[in-house]
């Protein structure tokens, strides 16, 4: 019996020793990894490094970030403050939240910081993309791109965008099954970008293949830069190469399809603007610019479109107020949108619609933030940002923590009304499109698209949630519902109006 006790104690001691050894094997490399990055502080600066954790060797905290989403940043912000360090997507970075901190980063372009995307993003978008250009090259390219989003250009795109939205909503309404709004909004954004902005005439079957390829590209834009078979990075590269091949074919065939064309598309404007600035774009530059245009329209617009549908479902009073504005402006009559094309000035004049879109983008900013790299050591919120470190300024967290917005978690479009104007306190409290010299060039186009979608939803559709509860939102790679948001859409022809009039009382979630 005594020997059996010794055997048990010995086994427990061995197990304990193994557990301690394993803990040390994990803890020691992790501690050395932490020290490795702490040692990069600027010793000539007396300020301390930001607090934070660098996670595990090589992968850092990438897995935590991927699975926790917005909760990852919120938990670390609560623990370490508005400026903290971490290690994501294969590199160290300092995450920055708060209007004043963000203002210093954005206004410090060319003096304190310059652009610096994660390696995977930079590689997949390409060296000729606007996002990757710096200095004089960036200023020149931005000037060329600016004409693509001018008032005149938007007026030209508007009828075609409205037509694509109307056709899409008709398809949704004719489907007897619920629609996955996020996935179909991606398809809508993609069709708008390819057919309207770029003017490509691609067969439907080829469009389906191109859409799937682009989805794979977007899903791997933010990935660990490890080029191995079956890695996300390798999938992204393959998707990029396939897209460039298809786009080159479409660009070369484009002059063959000009007959009967009644508007100027973004690619036409881009080429014309380049000539006006004494620049001739190479085929590689055109391919990368085209992918960048589609990318900008695809992921973020689909995210915001889905958030818009969800909030109109959640808040029927907001939708009814939107309909009332359309009625008062003569755009909605007897429950249906008046026939004819909308004008850009008419859309701009809809003030409550503008408030609704602004509030959707405040509460559900599609993009988490932007990336920079410190070109010199500087102070931020009492800590040092060492030269050479990546900096990510947070859009979403800055919105969530801003003191200028009352009841910050509530969906309240009237906060942007002329009477309240909660965003007047400072432009860096509200920045869904970034800020500074790198603010999103396409913000007016994105806003126009969302406004047109809202008008068509309010005046030309009835829709209801097909699940018992609203889904949870996740933020990687952009904000979207976990289930895509399952919604049943109904048409508004005369017969359908009678059906809906009878069923409205029974469908509390129908708007």
Curated annotation (Swiss-Prot):
Its EC number is 1.14.13.-. InterPro entries: Cyt_P450 (IPR001128), Cyt_P450_CS (IPR017972), Cyt_P450_E_grp-IV (IPR002403), Cyt_P450_sf (IPR036396). It catalyses: all-trans-retinoate + reduced [NADPH--hemoprotein reductase] + O2 = all-trans-4-hydroxyretinoate + oxidized [NADPH--hemoprotein reductase] + H2O + H(+); all-trans-retinoate + reduced [NADPH--hemoprotein reductase] + O2 = all-trans-18-hydroxyretinoate + oxidized [NADPH--hemoprotein reductase] + H2O + H(+). PROSITE patterns: CYTOCHROME_P450. Keywords: Endoplasmic reticulum, Heme, Iron, Lipid metabolism, Membrane, Metal-binding, Microsome, Monooxygenase, Oxidoreductase. It is a peripheral membrane protein. GO terms for molecular function: all-trans retinoic acid 18-hydroxylase activity; heme binding; iron ion binding; monooxygenase activity; retinoic acid 4-hydroxylase activity. The keyword 4Fe-4S does not apply. One of its GO terms (biological process) is hindbrain development. It is an enzyme of class 1 (oxidoreductase). Signal peptide: none annotated. It is found in: Endoplasmic reticulum membrane; Microsome membrane. Its cofactor is heme. Its main location: endoplasmic reticulum. It holds the Pfam family p450. Heme binds at residue 440. The keyword Iron applies. Belongs to the cytochrome P450 family. PANTHER family: CYTOCHROME P450 26, CYTOCHROME P450 26B1. A cytochrome P450 monooxygenase involved in the metabolism of retinoates (RAs), the active metabolites of vitamin A, and critical signaling molecules in animals. RAs exist as at least four different isomers: all-trans-RA (atRA), 9-cis-RA, 13-cis-RA, and 9,13-dicis-RA, where atRA is considered to be the biologically active isomer, although 9-cis-RA and 13-cis-RA also have activity. This is Cytochrome P450 26B1.
